[in-house]
Amino acid sequence: MVPSVAATAAIGVAIAQGALAASFSVSGQQFQVTAKSLDGTGFVQYGALDQTKKGNKPVAVVGLQSAKITNLCQAVTIPTPIGDVSMTLKAGGGEQVDAQKLYIDATDMKANARFDEVDIGVAVDATTKGPGPATPGENGRGAYVPGSFAQQAKTVHFTDVDQKAWATSAGTFTLPGLTMNVAMGGAECKN
C-alpha cells in the first residue's frame, strides 16, 4: 500500500460521537468522509480484515496519536423499507476538530499527502511512531497478520481528502460546531 492510502483512515473522525466501547461489531455499511485538511502526529498504517455479518472486508487500518481536522463532513446512506435515509454530520468549519488515539478502517481515498520521517515496509509489530496495532477486534480494529507490512511516520499532512471507510474508533473526539442532518434519499459530502 502506498502512503497516500493511509490518509483514508485519518479522516474518519467525523463519525464518532465520543469515545467508543472497547470493541464493537462492524456494521458492513461503508460511509464517506471528506475534509479540507488533516494534520496528524504519530502515524501508523497496515492491512487487515474487518469481520462483518456479510463476511471479511479488507481494509487499511490507520492509527494516529493525535489529529487536527478542518471542514469535516461524514455522510452515510442507509437502505430502509421506506427508501434510502441519509445522515450527514459536519464539524470543524471554524475551530478544528481534535481526535486522540484515532483508528479507522478504510478502503478508498483521494487526497494530497505529505509524510515526515516516514518508514515504509516496517513489520506491523515493530512500529514505534504511531499508536501501533491492537488485538484483532479491539476498538473496531481488524485482524492483522503478525510481522506483515506496515508504514509509519512522525507527522502527516493531508488536504482535499475524500475517503470511504467501514469503521472508526478513538479515545477522544472534540467536534466544534457539530451539525447533523437526516433526510430521505442519498447523501454525499463535497470538498
Feature-to-residue mapping (PLM):
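N-terminal export and membrane-targeting signals
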Residues: 1-6
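Extended, solvent-exposed, non-transmembrane regions
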Residues: 10-191
